[in-house]
Amino acid sequence: MKQSGIDQFSGKRVWVIGASSGIGEACAKALILQGAKVALSSRRAERLDQIALCGDVNQSLVIPLDVTNDEQLQEGYKTILKAWGGIDLLLFVSGMYVPLRADNFDI
């Protein structure tokens, strides 16, 4: 049976990469408040610590990393595996908005 409502993510193990601001932060907070275990990653560790405090600190992992560094991503994954045994959902929302016209960049 499909879960719905507030308990849809309860107990799920979620890794949010890009969790320190914007969409990533909003998703991370919502997931924490819905009872998910959330691993928070970005380069800004102090910001991740603040976000982790929006819920039970035992349901969050703070894993500072730079997404351009493959070794850091692998170590982050290993940290989650050791703590929780796996990941149910990955949200990769790292990045930033750069206002450019469509004809000014390559796709």
Spans of model-derived segments:
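Conserved glycine-rich Rossmann-like NAD(P)H-binding loop of the short-chain dehydrogenase/reductase
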Residues: 34-51
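Conserved mid-core segment of classical short-chain dehydrogenase/reductases
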Residues: 74, 97-107
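Flexible N-terminal pre-Rossmann segment of NAD(P)-dependent oxidoreductases
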Residues: 1-15
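A conserved hydrophobic alpha-helix of the Rossmann-fold in NAD(P)-dependent oxidoreductases
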Residues: 48, 73-80
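Rossmann-fold scaffold of SDR-type NAD(P)-dependent oxidoreductases
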Residues: 17, 87-95
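Rossmann-fold cofactor-recognition segment
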Residues: 55-71
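Conserved glycine-rich cofactor-binding loop
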Residues: 20-21
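N-terminal Rossmann-fold NAD(P) dinucleotide-binding loop
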Residues: 24-25
